[in-house]
Curated annotation (Swiss-Prot):
Catalytic activity line of the entry: O-phospho-L-seryl-[protein] + H2O = L-seryl-[protein] + phosphate; O-phospho-L-threonyl-[protein] + H2O = L-threonyl-[protein] + phosphate
Source organism superkingdom: Eukaryota
GO biological process: signal transduction
Protein name stated in the entry: Probable protein phosphatase 2C 65
Enzyme Commission number(s): 3.1.3.16
SUPFAM superfamilies found in the cross-reference section: PP2C-like
Positions contributing to Mn(2+) 2 binding: 85, 290, 334
Record-linked CDD domains: PP2Cc
Length: 399
C-alpha cells in the first residue's frame, strides 16, 4: 500500500472486479542453494518477481526490487535476502537505490582499523545493530542523491540475514517476512516482521505526536467521521498519514526509506529488528512485498509454501493466487516479489514429507501460462487486458 501520489487511493468497493484462478507451476522463478557451514545448514532458495497489471498504464515499470547476497561480505555463514517495494512517481528508482545501497552500508558498519590492523564488522558481531545503522544511512544517502527524487516517493525494505544459526530480520514499511515452523504436527506461521502502518495503535500514536493527521481518504473527503478510528483492513480504504494542513503525503505506512516530505509528520526510516535462533522446527522463511499479503494472510502463505517441495513451485503458486485475488477485488494487480528460503538439515528434512500434494504437470503449466499472460498483456495493445488474464485463469486445468 503506497502513498497518495503513488498506488491507488480509491476505496476498494468503488473499484472494478476481475475473474477466477488456479495455482501451481514454476512460472519463471529462479533456484539457488548455499551452505551455512558454521550451523550445518543448507539454504535452498527461490525468487520470483512479477510486475503488476495496471490497465491505464500498459507497460508500467515494476516498482519492486529484491536482492540475494549469499556469503555476504565474504563470510560463509552470512546470507542476505531482501525485498523493496517502491511507491510514488519515482518509486522504482527509490527501490533500486535502496537495493544497491543496503549491502554496501550493512557490510561497512563499524569497519575500521583495529588495534592490530584488522577491520571490525558489526554485521558479523551484532547484525541487529548493523541493520539499525545501515537502513537510516541508506535513507540519508537517498535524500542526498541527485539521481533520485524522493521528496514524495520512497520504498519499503524488509531484509532477512541468516547469520550462522540465527536469523535477523529488519523491516521498514509494510513488506513482510514470515517463517514456517513445525508445531504439533503442522506448519505454523511465525511472524518475523510487523507491518508499520496506521492500523497499529503504537505507530498511529507516534506519527500523531509528530503532528500528523491519520485518516482514510473518505475521512479526508468528509464522507466519514474524521474523528473515528474504526478502519477495517479489508475495506480497501486504509488509514493514511497526512500533514496537519495539507493533502500530502497520504502514506498508508508509517515508516519507509525516502519520502522526505513525510518525515516531518513522523514517517521514519528506523527499522524494527527481530532475531530468532534457527531450530530444527524452522522449515523455511518467506520475504515478500505487500502485493502478496494484501489478500493472503501469513498463515495462508506458509500453508502454500509447505504444500510444495520445490520453492519455485511455491513462488509461482503464491503469485498466481495473489493475482487471482487482486482480480477478484480490483481492476488492477500490484507488483509481486517473493523470496522463499528452505532451511535444510538432517533433523528437519523428513518433515517435508507431510506435504499435501505434489503439483501436477497441468498445474505447473497453468501457473507458467498465468505469469506469461500477465507479462504479455502489460505490453500489448489489448482492448480488455483484465479479461485476457481472466480467460487464462478460467482455462486452467483442475488438479
Amino acid at each position: 500500500m503506497g502513498c497518495a501520489q503513488g498506488k491507488c487511493c480509491v476505496p476498494r468497493r468503488q473499484r472494478g472486479r476481475g475473474g477466477g484462478g488456479a495455482v501451481g507451476g514454476r512460472g519463471g522463478a529462479t533456484l539457488g542453494r548455499v551452505a551455512v557451514p558454521g550451523a550445518g545448514l543448507v539454504l535452498e532458495y527461490a525468487t520470483l518477481a512479477v510486475a503488476g497489471l495496471y490497465p491505464d498504464s500498459p507497460g508500467r515499470e515494476s516498482q519492486d526490487a529484491h536482492l540475494v547476497a549469499t556469503r555476504f561480505a565474504g563470510h560463509p555463514d552470512l546470507h542476505l535476502f531482501a525485498v523493496f517495494d517502491g511507491h510514488g512517481a519515482c518509486g522504482a528508482a527509490c527501490a533500486g537505490f535502496a537495493r544497491d545501497a543496503l549491502p554496501r552500508l550493512l557490510a561497512g558498519v563499524g569497519v575500521g582499523a583495529g588495534e592490530e590492523g584488522g577491520g571490525r564488522m558489526v554485521v558479523v558481531e551484532d547484525p541487529a545493530a548493523a541493520f539499525r545503522e545501515a537502513l537510516p544511512a541508506a535513507n540519508a544517502e537517498m535524500h542526498a542523491a541527485d539521481e533520485v527524487d524522493d521528496s514524495m516517493s520512497g520504498t519499503t525494505a524488509v531484509a532477512a540475514l541468516v547469520a550462522g544459526g540465527a536469523l535477523h530480520v529488519a523491516n521498514v514499511g509494510d513488506s513482510r517476512a514470515v517463517a514456517g515452523v513445525w508445531r504439533e504436527g503442522r506448519v505454523a506461521a511465525e511472524e518475523l516482521s510487523w507491518d508499520q502502518t496506521p492500523f497499529r495503535a503504537d505507530e498511529r500514536a507516534r506519527v500523531k505526536a509528530c503532528g500528523a493527521r491519520v485518516m482514510s481518504v473518505e475521512q479526508v473527503e468528509g464522507v466519514r467521521d474524521p474523528e473515528a478510528e474504526s478502519w477495517v483492513a479489508d475495506e480497501g480504504d486504509p488509514p493514511r498519514v497526512w500533514a496537519r494542513d495539507g493533502l500530502y503525503p497520504g502514506t498508508a505506512f508509517t515508516r519507509s526509506l525516502g519520502d522526505q516530505a513525510a518525515e516531518a509528520v513522523g514517517v521514519i526510516a528506523e527499522p524494527e529488528v527481530k532475531s530468532v535462533e534457527i531450530t530444527p522446527a524452522h522449515l523455511f522463511f518467506v520475504v515478500a512485498s505487500d502485493g502478496v499479503f494484501e489478500f493472503l494472510s501469513s498463515q495462508d502463505v506458509v500453508d502454500m509454501v509447505a504444500a510444495y517441495e520445490d520453492p519455485r513451485e511455491a513462488c509461482s503458486a503464491i503469485a498466481a493466487e495473489s493475482y487471482k485475488l487482486w482480480l477478484e477485488h480490483e481492476n488492477r494487480t500490484d507488483d509481486i516479489t517473493i523470496i522463499i528460503v528452505h532451511i535444510r538439515d538432517s533433523e528437519n528434512v523428513d518433515k517435508f514429507l507431510y506435504r499435501k500434494r505434489i503439483p501436477s504437470a497441468g498445474s505447473c503449466c497453468c501457473a507458467m501460462a498465468v505469469v506469461l499472460a500477465l507479462q504479455s498483456v502489460r505490453h500489448a495493445p489489448v482492448a480488455n487486458p483484465l479479461g485476457a488474464v481472466a480467460r487464462v485463469f478460467l482455462r486452467a486445468p483442475a488438479d
